Amino acid sequence: MEMILLTLIKTHGGDIKGYTKKKINYFLGIPYANQPINEHRFKHSKCLKTWNKTIEATSFKSIPPQPYNKLETFFSSHAQLFNQSEDCLYLNIWCQNNQYNNKPVIIYFYGGGFVNGHGSQELYTPEHIVARHDVIVITFNYRLGALGFLDWSYF
């Protein structure tokens, strides 16, 4: 039976709880900006700098609203249905479970023509990279389509 341990890290912004599995730390679904909903829908997001409660970063969160992508299903080993929501500004972090500092950081920007994609796609999860190399890998979601790129500032 595979052992999964909860992992708590303390940051300048607050505490984040993830988990460790097969010597890899996972911190999934960390909010990095305020929710871009309601009156904030077509405005620039505001960076989330601090939080009061521990962030439970143990599972992927909502992905940006987008049309169905047949290729994502084709390249997945199992059916994955992600909740789609305008509240989608989350990042995911993977790193080896060791105490070494000053690791290289890889930040992955997914493609999809600003219409499809998300930072939780199985095809791009970096466990194989992190297992072989002592690096930190970050994926994240960003707003797509009109919700991400329609500029209303002139109106």
Label the model's feature ranges:
Residues 2-155:
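Non-catalytic accessory segments of hydrolases
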